[in-house]
Curated annotation (Swiss-Prot):
PANTHER family: GLUTAMINASE
One GO biological process term: glutamine catabolic process
Taxonomic source organism: Corynebacterium glutamicum (strain ATCC 13032 / DSM 20300 / JCM 1318 / BCRC 11384 / CCUG 27702 / LMG 3730 / NBRC 12168 / NCIMB 10025 / NRRL B-2784 / 534)
Pfam families: Glutaminase, STAS
Positions bound to substrate: S65, N114, E160, N167, Y191, Y243, V261
Name the UniProt record assigns to this protein: Glutaminase
Subunit field text: Homotetramer.
Keyword Hydrolase: yes
Keywords of this entry: Hydrolase
Domain STAS: 316-413
SUPFAM superfamilies per UniProt: beta-lactamase/transpeptidase-like, SpoIIaa-like
Broad class of enzyme this protein falls into: hydrolase
Amino acid sequence: MLTMPIPEYLHEILDDVRDTTSGELADYIPELKSADPNPLAVALCTVNGHIYSAGDDDIEFTMQSISKPFAYALALQECGFDEVSASVALEPSGEAFNELSLDGENRPMNPMINAGAIAINQLINGSDSTVEDRVEKIRHYFSELAGRELTIDRVLAESELAGADRNLSIAHMLRNYGVIEDEAHDAVLSYTLQCAIKVTTRDLAVMTATLAAGGTHPITGKKLLDARVCRLTLSVMASAGMYDEAGQWLSTVGIPAKSGVAGGLIGILPGQLGIATFSPRLNPKGNSVRGVKIFKQLSDDMGLHLMSTEQVSGHAVRSITRDGDTTFIQMQGAMNFSASESFLHAIVEHNFEGTEVVLDLTRVLSFHPVAIRMIKEGLKRIRDAGFEVFILDPDDVLPDFMFSDGTICKERV
């Protein structure tokens, strides 16, 4: 039985950052100030529904600001772009997340800062909704995105509300400008309960993969969001998801992302996968220190930068067929992380028989370095399972015919 190497790679990344102890817990929320600073987790989910994770992936934590893009998507789905944009603009603020950043029409600058998120929250379930009905609508929808029933940490919400003076002042100003209709306390209560929904990194990976897939749930196949809603949400995440660190993030990491002060961090590569990390210590910008390191390494190693000029492959595994004692795996397109992940998943699921396996690269256009490493590791595991492995590469798209351990693989001519 072949095994998948991706979880091993994720464990290696966690080991690389585990000794990083810089950063501080969020100290303005008592429940978060006393949280365990040590948990560390990472999870990936492809648009095909393949989930990989490592570390403390079963630990629940509150979404906090990570809830903002999902709430924005829900508001867009319910109300439409025109109604949402009448309340909240789409420009980066360049200021801290808890500033009252308004444009010339007194709209919050974007949905990723607190002012914008409070306004977005008030659009969901209609302006005449009660707090509990609105929060339940959000919780239920987030549960659909995660693929399981999520719950609210009401103890933490009460702790957060006790020190919510700044958000209350923002809500009062928004009400004064006619952006929201509810009383300021009710608006902040609703928003705070939204932030207190509990998730794991695996939940967030599935939720983000739904956005990456244009609104189709990667596990259930259910259509939850319109593709245009997902595109708008990812655009805002790219420009404003990391607050006043957004420009630096997009340049160096290149993944639409959103952070939360509980230590969560999510990222989305459109059409490919969703990523989530959890580590509670934060940098001065309010982003997880180890989470940022993990994302930078994933982006570099896996070629995930949104502005990469590498071609993106569709269905990478064209076919797996058998002729006598020989199994042929035919690949196609440009080999990047997602394409090579499809290859690895296919060989793990396939019941190989016979004595030989031939990897046919006749239709392959190019290889990203990460794909070379992943393909070579997959071939090594086929060899170690007792099969003789050959590579058919008439256009020399592979730089060499070595397995991942440095031994030579045979060429098929």
